[in-house]
Swiss-Prot record:
GO molecular-function terms, A-Z: rRNA binding; structural constituent of ribosome
Function: One of the primary rRNA binding proteins, it binds directly near the 3'-end of the 23S rRNA, where it nucleates assembly of the 50S subunit.
GO terms under biological process: translation
Keyword RNA-binding: yes
Superkingdom of origin: Bacteria
Name of protein: Large ribosomal subunit protein uL3
Keyword Transport among UniProt keywords: no
Keyword line: Ribonucleoprotein, Ribosomal protein, RNA-binding, rRNA-binding
Region described as Disordered: spans on this chain: 126-170
GO CC annotation terms, alphabetical: cytosolic large ribosomal subunit
Length: 218
């Protein structure tokens, strides 16, 4: 069952292995999530599972969403995500999805929004080298040439320039789960994941392990 789970990034810490080596890890509070909808090939054209996560206030949920969530017995859910599956065996509307569906040593893909840094210049956004800082130079943090004059007479699309930095959806693939704490709904994942502490994360079984597709992956 290749269903993922939604969670919240708590921050980073250290995990010590059996040999005493310090490993940087990310702590993720994952679930419990509620199955809010089951889609079938006969009705929807494909099989999928929709889950909900996160508490919210009732006045922030509109009537269509409230009617949709009432079917699963849970109304106050803030985030919804859908996962395509091959079959719906063993899945029930309103059932809980917890970190118990993962295990230590498993590879996962973690998606989230990167930290937004606002409007940033060339050096911070793209890592450009700065100009000479000596007296007489007029190019300290300028980008330099952005293109020729008459030909082509324009700036090519995709030219790296100053602009909004961060706040993009990114996926870190092939991360290893080092520990699963079912009592605290906690996943300890090796390495870093996108987003700042408190950011919403989508954790799902890895599609690829090494250079080969994972079992059940597409």
């Amino acid at each position: 069952m290749s269903i993922g789970i939604l969670g919240k990034k708590l921050g980073m810490s250290q995990f010590f292995d059996d040999q005493g080596r310090a490993i940087p890890v990310t702590l993720i509070e994952a679930g419990p999530c509620r199955i809010t909808q089951l889609k079938t090939s006969e009705i929807d054209g494909y099989a999928a599972v929709q889950i909900g996560f996160g508490d919210t206030r009732e006045k922030l949920i509109n009537k269509p969403s409230k009617g949709h969530l009432t079917k699963s017995g849970e109304v106050l859910l803030k985030h919804l995500r859908e996962y395509r599956v091959e079959g719906l065996e063993g899945l029930e509307l309103g059932a809980a999805i917890t970190v118990g569906s993962f295990e230590a040593g498993q590879k996962v893909d973690v998606s989230g929004d990167t930290m937004g840094r606002g409007f940033a210049g060339y050096q911070k956004r793209h890592g450009f080298s700065r100009g000479p800082m000596s007296h007489g130079s007029k190019n300290h943090r300028e980008p330099g040439s952005t293109g020729a004059g008459t030909t082509p007479g324009r700036i090519y699309p995709g030219k790296r320039m100053a602009g909004r930095y961060g706040g993009k959806k990114r996926t870190t693939r092939g991360l290893t789960i080092l520990k699963v704490d079912s009592n605290r709904n906690l996943l300890v994942v090796k390495g870093s994941v996108p987003g700042k502490p408190g950011a919403l994360l989508n954790i799902r079984p890895a599609k690829r392990v090494g250079n080969k597709p994972a079992q059940g992956g597409k």
